[in-house]
Amino acid sequence: MRLIDVNSFKLQEFSGSDIPPYAILSHTWGDAEVSFQEWQDLQEASRKAGYSKIYGACQQAKADGLEWLWVDTNCIDKTSSAELSEAINSMFQWYAQSQICYAYLVDVPTGTTNNESDQDALMERFRESRWFTRGWTLQELLAPTSVVFYAYDWTSIGSRETSLSDEIHHATGIDRGYLINDSIMSPLSAGASTKMSWLSKREVTREEDLAYCMLGLFDINMPLLYGEGMKAFTRLQEEIVKSDNDHTIFCWEWIYAITPTNWSSFLAPSPLAFRNSHRFRRRDPNLDETGGLSTYQMTNATL
């Protein structure tokens, strides 16, 4: 992975055990982000709107005693399909292995409040932030050990695992136990239908990313095929079926507005079909008196 030296702003590549402690930035993309190629000329890069949040994240990392930072806009060479595929398949782990994640909310002006009324207004803007509506920020919320939220002016709003867990629950529908580093309620241990219900509330720019942004949460690797549309979401479900005997993957709702009339699959046509599926829980085979869950497999015909 490439990391930014927070002092020189230069990029350096690391791998395996050589990767140093680093901070990581989570944000929503705007119209003038700085690419890997553009970062090679820092004078030109600094003229783009996307530069300021990278600079701010570097300053925050320095304040936190860290020398390295990862940002998805300029640390990945997106002109290389192989590098992009590797990065997307690795991204959950990169967030999980970070020392701290800075969630930057460009649509929350400041985290500074002077009274209770200001605090209430801040929390309302926090819950309504676009950051909570994007597909990619779901794993960025759940993978790191620590997530600290910052407003547009880089004032701190609070952390996921402590002061903001209730607000995040209200904004996302994600149970608080998955937010506070509960040793029992790891996000990876949540049932398939629960994870899909989290996704159903989010949007992406390219519909394939509805599948690709969930690879880490399901601990799945699969090739990226931009241009395949919603077939990517079907492929994701097929990989889940192959790797996990979790029956909640079938707990989806037939919604006529999103389900093709000729749909004959056991798999859902869209994450929206899971919008009410958070209430289902995967069964523990160790507690099943019948001796375990029935198994299933994908064939060249069907499930």
Question: What are the functions of these language-model segments?
Answer:
Residues G177-L303:
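Short helix/strand-capping turn motifs
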